[in-house]
C-alpha cells in the first residue's frame, strides 16, 4: 500500500530548488512523500521542463491572467484534484492570501535565503536578501525553511543552516553558496520531516 504523502511544488522560475527536491526523492532522502504536481505561475519557467523530465504532472496558472481569487482558485482546484497534502514553495513569486494559507495550516513550507528573523519579510527576496546581508556586514548568513502563514516569512521555523560570508563575496556569489550549501540541503530534509510527521499521524488513525 502506497501511503506516501502527496506533495505539490509551486514554482515561478528556473526550478533549482525543485531539482534539489526531485534529486532527494530519487536518492532516498525524501521517502515519506512523493511529488505529484508542479504548479507554475509562469508558462515559460524552466522548472516545468525539470518536472516533465522527472515525469511529474504540471499545471500552469499565470498570475497576470487572473484576479487574486481566480488565480488561487485555479491552484486550489489543481491541488484538490491530485489530493495534495503538502505544498512546497520553491521560488514561487506570488504572495498567497490568508484565505489560501488557512486551508493548509502547517502544510505549506517555504525556503528563504537568510537566517530568519534577519533579512526577511516584505521586499526581501532574491538577490536583495544577499545584498542586504553584505551591506549590513554580517559574518554569517544562511537559509531557513519555515511554515507559511499570513505574515511574509512569519511562520514557524522548521530548519535552518548557516553559511559563512567571505570578504570578497558579491550578492551573486553569496546567493550561489547559500543555495548549494544550505537551501538545496535543508529544503528536501524539511519536506521529508513534515511528510513523515503527517504520515505518522495518518497511521495512528488507522
Which residues fall in each region the model found?
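One-carbon transfer enzymes
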Residues: 1-206
